[in-house]
Amino acid sequence: MSIISTKYLLQDAQTKGYAVPAFNIHNAETIQAILEVCSEMQSPVILAGTPGTFKHIALEEIYALCSAYSNSYDIPLALHLDHHESLEDIRRKVNAGVRSAMIDGSHFPFEENVKLVKSVVDFCHARDCSVEAELGRLGGVEDDMSVDAESAFLTDPQEAKRFVELTGVDSLAVAIGTAHGLYTKCPKIDFQRLAEIREVVDIPLVLHGASDVPDEYVRRTIELGVCKVNVATELKIAFADAVKKWFAENPDGNDPRYYMRVGMDAMKDVVRSKITVCGSYKKLLQPSHC
């Protein structure tokens, strides 16, 4: 098996009306936990790493782990650069073998965002690397970056249409009321806005900030064109809470083979749930389609 571009996964999802889950990874254990479930449920998967992830563990090491696990579990997977902000950073990582990148210029004015995204698209498309961009801006905390509610804004459908036409981007992350992190109250998802975006944009749409969003809301966004669902915070919390509980019950414990497995198993429960919600169960692509 191999590390592939997300475009093959998202094209199939768009055609068949499901979404591919994109799970954020941090180390060997999180990669293994996710792929154990994807193998079990025969689900396509995108493994996403933020710039902070690659500060913690080198890209070359993550790439080697993903490649090895892809072969071990017989799953083609996409290793995705999540929320990267510069062409230079993406260029280096794509040259190292990555075939999926998100360039996040959502903090820039429209024209600057377009210019940045177009430069990344031109570079990546020449190397069979798919590109995701974001228009509108989600609130919350992602990596080390915090966006307060006043700085967040929703995606305008007509701007989205123009943005896609000008950049040639492969998928578009839209701001429709979700936020990075957990919610203090039930999020207000603007389904009408999403439907209007779908009417004028024909590429796969991406839902960021899907942790803690009610399942029925996520399913509705998929019905309205979302083909990729990002999950990060729920995975970290499940892992951490399980490890904390294990140490509370085993105060003299010190063997990582035990407490890491407890964390992995808790994370696996979240992964199973998200695969079910996304409708990606038994949607694994054959290598000939990748």
UniProtKB/Swiss-Prot annotation:
InterPro entries with a match to the protein in the record: Aldolase_TIM (IPR013785), Class_II_FBP_aldolase (IPR050246), FBA_II (IPR000771), TagBP_ald_KbaY (IPR023788), TagBP_ald_KbaY/GatY (IPR011288)
Protein name, UniProt field: D-tagatose-1,6-bisphosphate aldolase subunit KbaY
Task: Give the keywords, sorted.
Answer: Lyase, Metal-binding, Zinc
Main function: Catalytic subunit of the tagatose-1,6-bisphosphate aldolase KbaYZ, which catalyzes the reversible aldol condensation of dihydroxyacetone phosphate (DHAP or glycerone-phosphate) with glyceraldehyde 3-phosphate (G3P) to produce tagatose 1,6-bisphosphate (TBP). Requires KbaZ subunit for full activity and stability.
Q: Source species, please? A: Citrobacter koseri (strain ATCC BAA-895 / CDC 4225-83 / SGSC4696)
Catalytic reactions on record = D-tagatofuranose 1,6-bisphosphate = D-glyceraldehyde 3-phosphate + dihydroxyacetone phosphate
Q: Which NCBIfam families match?
A: cbbA, PRK09195.1, PRK12737.1, PRK12738.1, tag_bisphos_ald
> What cofactors does this protein use?
Zn(2+)
Q: Mind telling me which PROSITE patterns this protein's record contains?
A: ALDOLASE_CLASS_II_1, ALDOLASE_CLASS_II_2
Active site (UniProt): 82 (proton donor)
UniProt binding sites for Zn(2+) = 83, 180, 208
